[in-house]
């Protein structure tokens, strides 16, 4: 609520800029022969047309609305127990999280001991090897921009070179927040020759301390799996022109490889590849895996 007050008033109010932007977009689309900006934009999207987008949204509504309505009522019931009769948007996240803890008795901190960052990275590589037959070998003789950066050579099963893969996972004062995939060289033509890519993922994961190694939350593990999906898309690209390589593809496709990779994290077989207690080396218990899966399905309507 406080954030909204700052955004919608005073020197930070950008409503006028947004209105001008949407007007100019509409005018541009009309000049180019389209009915509206959406129709113009969708010429370079898989959806292809506003009619297809609307059909897709209608199908989603039919499937999700009953579940969403039921889930929202559960959140409202919990809020009423605290005397909140009219649940507002700014209260929704708080009561949703409270309900999640009540239903699943699930605390992210329970999982940290099983997600040592080195084990997570090894697990990601195992998944990639099982699914795509590719191998990751750490190399030390490549220049890097910071001592924390690790570099891996990615090869096909037959030894053919696919990519160099740089990982830079922990926060520094000079680093932007968040996590992302990028490349130092895309796959495609470079100086007249089709080159393999130089791919990187960058993050700001929980760092190690004097007492403990880097132990991640489940959300952080999910983030790295997601970004690695983008990285895989880049590593496995095989095109002549880099404008067609990952991530320079249709924007309503670009998140698919990352979502697929992220999805594997919810599978028991995946977690058993790498989720081991950093002190005892015991596998993550089935009970915790079931809690993870149940919590992932929570409030998905």
Describe the role of every protein-language-model region.
Residues 26-33, 128, 207, 212-235, ...:
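Active-site recognition of the HExxH zinc-binding catalytic motif
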Residues 1-8, 301:
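Short intrinsically disordered, low-complexity coil segments enriched in acidic
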Residues 5-8, 12, 20:
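Substrate/cofactor-recognition hotspot
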Residues 8, 108, 208, 238-241:
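General secondary-structure edge motif
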Residues 10, 14, 113, 117, ...:
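Alpha-helix N-cap/helix-initiation motif
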Residues 227, 231-264:
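Zinc-dependent metallopeptidase catalytic helix centered on the HExxH motif
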Residues 3, 205-207:
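Short, histidine-centered active-site or binding-site loop motifs used for metal coordination
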Residues 19, 23-24, 28-204, 254, ...:
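Active-site-proximal, well-structured secondary-structure segments within enzyme catalytic domains
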């Amino acid at each position: 609520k406080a954030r909204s007050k700052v955004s919608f008033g005073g020197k930070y109010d950008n409503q006028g800029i947004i209105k001008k932007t949407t007007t100019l977009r509409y005018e541009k689309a009309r000049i180019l022969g389209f009915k509206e900006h959406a129709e113009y934009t969708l010429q370079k999207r898989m959806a292809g047309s506003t009619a297809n987008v609307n059909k897709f949204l209608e199908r989603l509504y039919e499937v999700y609305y009953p579940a969403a309505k039921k889930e929202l009522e559960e959140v409202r019931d919990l809020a009423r127990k605290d005397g909140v009769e009219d649940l507002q948007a700014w209260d929704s996240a708080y009561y949703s999280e409270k309900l999640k803890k009540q239903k699943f008795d699930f605390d992210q901190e329970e999982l940290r001991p099983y997600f040592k960052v080195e084990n997570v990275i090894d697990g990601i590589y195992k998944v990639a090897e099982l699914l795509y037959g590719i191998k990751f070998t750490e190399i030390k003789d490549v220049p890097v921009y910071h001592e924390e950066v690790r570099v891996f050579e990615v090869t096909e099963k037959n030894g053919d070179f696919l990519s160099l893969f740089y990982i830079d996972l922990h926060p520094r004062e000079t680093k932007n927040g968040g996590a992302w995939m990028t490349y130092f060289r895309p796959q495609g033509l470079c100086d007249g020759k089709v080159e393999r890519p130089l791919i990187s993922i960058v993050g700001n994961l929980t760092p190690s301390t004097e007492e403990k190694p880097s132990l991640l939350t489940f959300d952080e593990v999910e983030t790295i799996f997601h970004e690695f999906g983008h990285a895989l898309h880049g590593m496995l690209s095989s095109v002549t022109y880099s404008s067609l390589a990952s991530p320079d593809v249709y924007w309503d496709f670009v998140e698919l490889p990352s979502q697929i990779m992220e999805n594997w994290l919810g599978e028991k077989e995946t977690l058993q590849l790498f989720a081991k207690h950093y002190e005892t080396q015991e596998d993550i218990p089935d009970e915790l895996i079931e809690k993870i899966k149940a919590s992932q399905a929570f409030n998905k309507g």
